[in-house]
Amino acid sequence: MAQPFVLLPTEDSHQTLRIQPPSTGIGLRGRIRVPGDKSISHRALMLGAIASGETTIEGLLLGEDPLSTAACFRAMGAEISELNSELVRVKGIGLQNLQEPLDVLNAGNSGTTIRLMMGLLAGQRDRFFCVTGDESLRSRPMARVIQPLSQMGAEIRGRQGNTRAPLAISGRSLQPIRYVSPIASAQVKSSILLAGLTCEGQTTVVEPALSRDHSERMFRAFGAKLTVNPEEISVTVEGPAELTGQPVVVPGDISSAAFWLVAAAIVPDSDLLIENVGVNPTRTGILEALQQMEAQITLENERIVAGEPVADLRVRSSNLQAIEIGGSLIPRLIDEVPILAVAAAFAKGTTIIRDAEELRVKESDRIAVMASELGRMGATISERPDGLEITGGAALTGATVDSYTDHRIAMSLAIAALQAKGQTQIQQAEAAAVSYPDFVPTLQQLLG
């Protein structure tokens, strides 16, 4: 039988993933693990670098985004051992001791890297930093972070009226603020809180809805004085902080697990166990949405590991039903909307996703791209200003589609291709390595 999954190099240094599902159906069965959580990996490297003493990190994601974070902090004097998923050691240099780098800091494709660093670097007194990224990152909005940091006294300059990278940051003494954020964004919140660590006094961020709380959990573990007001949906940090290195254990990334949750739900005769997945309640919106769609998903072996909830996720083939989602659920599954759209294409009825306009300023315009590329495969899908409308039941057909160098688009289209008739070619599929370097080998493991 021909190999069902082939990653082909192209003349322009990109890669095309060719998927030809087996002619006889083969369910997804067995046990797998997904890479370490990207959000936690970033934060462990950053806090380890600015703490005193040593931080050890087990299960670090070796994707391109955390590698960018590690490279930036090495350039500013932090000692970070050779990166591997077993154990990484970070020798911190202290909150106010980051060195002025000799060259431009490159965040690559990582919005988390550049936005969180902005808050931290803004308070590094009398030092200058220039931060850039790849073409995609240079097109993404930075004003949402620059504006509150400027209220704290930060001096940050960028392209297009201080809204785009590259960014020039002149470190200064900052003042604490109370900031009411117009959007629920863990990146905005975390950047302000990192800046607040360097201030004298209390810095508070109020959000319209709860965003992921990995920063808050890790701040506390490293010794920061932090309080949460759940009624107001606010977080307050007191500075200046004294952070101490800690052991960090990174669970599997639920955003990566989401691809296999949907795959096993839509591929007949599947029974898959995804082990060691982080199930932080600020991240489990995808589980709630899929369970609302009547996906057969259960949590097994639930436990707490290094302050984060962890479980094994079992998923079986399911008869999915359409749903309507929006509101406070969206920040808890914002990264999973592309793969949720794939699930909706195989559900009975019309699924409507609202309040997800943030997707238009991710690595790609994920609303437009999913409507376009999933539509090429025959899905009945249309854009809404703030989301998508998908009517399930249309038979998908293999097609040539484009990831637009967006890792979550590439992997979502690959899962859709598992149940499409004929061959699908996904252009610029190398983007998957941003968050899931072993995505294609895992495909091969399950169906190859």
UniProtKB/Swiss-Prot annotation:
What does the record give as EC number?
2.5.1.19
Q: What top-level class of enzyme does the UniProt entry assign?
A: transferase
Task: Name one cellular component (GO) term.
Answer: cytoplasm
Q: Which InterPro entries match?
A: Enolpyruvate_Tfrase_dom, Enolpyruvate_Tfrase_sf, EPSP_synthase, EPSP_synthase_CS, RNA3'P_cycl/enolpyr_Trfase_a/b
Subcellular localization(s) per the UniProt record: Cytoplasm
Keyword flag Hydrolase: no
Query: Which residues are responsible for catalysis?
Result: D335 (proton acceptor)
One MF term in the entry's GO annotations: 3-phosphoshikimate 1-carboxyvinyltransferase activity
Return the SUPFAM superfamilies for the record.
EPT/RTPC-like
Which NCBIfam families does the entry mention? aroA
| Cross-referenced PANTHER family | AROM/DEHYDROQUINATE SYNTHASE (PTHR21090), PENTAFUNCTIONAL AROM POLYPEPTIDE (PTHR21090:SF5)
For this entry, the protein name equals 3-phosphoshikimate 1-carboxyvinyltransferase
